[in-house]
Regions:
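Extracellular/periplasmic periplasmic-binding protein-like sensory domains
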Residues: 238-311, 372-374, 378-380
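Segments of small-molecule ligand-sensing domains
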Residues: 297-304, 318-378
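Extracytoplasmic "Venus flytrap"
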Residues: 36-57, 76-83, 105, 170-179, ...
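Short, low-complexity disordered leader/linker segments with a strong preference
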Residues: 1-34, 65-68, 382
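Beta-alpha junction/loop-to-helix N-cap segments that form part of ligand/metal-binding clefts
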Residues: 24-32, 48-54, 65-134, 143, ...
Length: 382
């Protein structure tokens, strides 16, 4: 009986060991690095998620065609919802994800980045810009500007270009992306002799009627209205401002990129809207022209900065993997250590910036580009 029990315990230990080593056993047969991301592929924010997915796919195809390292990229739909994002992340983890593109939008990314940190799966998000995405997580990095940096940079740009001194701000107070940009903008404005004469808010549930906010801005003589928000509420603001015969200067942020391809939107309403973005689809360098041409041919749209940032994420991974002499049979945890070492020391040139670097907190250093919408297209201001 004792002998039988000993054999049973030994067998159980063997099964447990094999189960615990399953990740590395699966990776042993990998011929490509598995890179996963979540984003809104359906729903109101789907322009962002599909753009990121499309940009990442083009980059992976180009890198694979070179015949060196091979990449397999997979995206799961999170519908811009934190709970669904975690479920999507777990699906990717079960698939064998070794490296992550995080989540496309900030609130879901706050949830999935916690899982990235706990699981030691390195993440490089193209566009989730909230501070909480990377804060306290040594293995979560951003290709995009952080929200506070966008707020500060927007205030500096408005002041430097003399776009107006009396400013109204309309922002969404239950959205971390909007709040983060708003808070640093209004903090920086007084230093630059910008007077915030109107500071009004809305929520996700009230994002249909902006008459009160627009009336407040107009009555207080705002020359420029700053809109730190995504494109959908902005599209309603532009339409309602026109109906109210209010025509200030408009200044947005990178979340507004995508408004020109929004279904049913009259692009003439966005004429003259200015924003800061890291990517200009009309740039004349060969790499940008090639990317834009491929994107148009494949997907029928002009790529926005979400597509370009995701494209850059995949190329940054390729550069880091080559420099680290990494191989697809490595565990996610081993790759995580190598990526931290590479990203804190390397310099990267991409579509969205040159000589990009990252600090130990995962924040990227690159310069934004001023853009204005003219005749239904983005045109460089600088």
């Amino acid at each position: 009986m004792k002998k039988f029990m000993a054999l049973a315990v030994a067998a159980l230990m063997l099964v447990t060991c094999l189960a615990g080593c399953g990740g590395s056993k699966d990776n042993a047969n990998n011929t490509a690095f598995k890179i996963g991301g979540t984003g809104p592929l359906t729903g109101d924010a789907s322009i962002y998620g599909n753009a990121a997915k499309n940009g990442a796919m083009i980059a992976a195809e180009e890198i694979n065609a070179e015949g060196g390292i091979q990449l397999e990229v997979r995206y799961e739909d999170d519908v811009h919802d934190p709970e669904k994002a975690v479920n999507a992340y777990n699906t990717l983890k079960d698939w064998g994800m070794q490296l992550s593109l995080g989540s496309v939008t900030s609130k879901p990314a706050e949830a999935t980045s916690a899982s990235n940190f706990e699981d030691r799966i390195f993440a490089l998000t193209p566009s989730a810009s909230a501070v909480a995405v990377t804060s306290g997580k040594d293995n979560v990095y951003q290709m995009c500007f952080m929200d506070p940096n966008q707020g500060t940079a927007s205030a500096q740009y408005i002041a430097k270009k003399g776009l107006g001194t009396k400013i109204a701000v309309i922002w969404q107070n239950d959205d971390v992306y909007s709040k983060g940009i708003h808070d640093t903008f209004v903090a920086k404005a007084p230093e630059l002799n910008l007077e915030v004469v109107s500071d009004t808010t809305f929520t996700k549930d009230s994002a249909t009627d902006f008459s009160v906010q627009l009336a407040d801005a107009q009555n207080k003589g705002a020359e420029l209205v700053f809109l730190p928000m995504y494109y959908r509420p902005a599209s309603l603001i532009f339409a309602q401002a026109k109906a109210a015969n209010y025509a200030p200067k408009w200044f947005g942020v990178d979340g507004m990129d995508g408004i020109l391809t929004m279904k049913g939107f009259d692009t003439s309403l966005a004429e003259g809207v200015m924003l800061l973005t890291p990517f200009n689809a009309d740039a004349t360098d060969e790499r940008t022209k090639s990317f834009v041409t491929k994107y148009k041919e494949r997907f029928g749209d002009v790529p926005n900065q979400f597509a370009a940032d995701a494209y850059d994420c995949v190329y940054a991974y390729a550069q880091a993997l080559k420099a680290a002499n990494a191989t697809p049979d490595m565990s996610a945890e081993d790759l995580c250590s190598k990526m931290i070492e590479q990203f804190t020391t390397m310099t990267f040139n991409g579509l969205t910036g040159t000589n990009m670097t990252w600090n130990k907190d995962g924040q990227v250093s690159k310069d934004p580009k001023g853009m204005v919408i003219q005749n239904g297209a983005y045109v460089g201001l600088d």
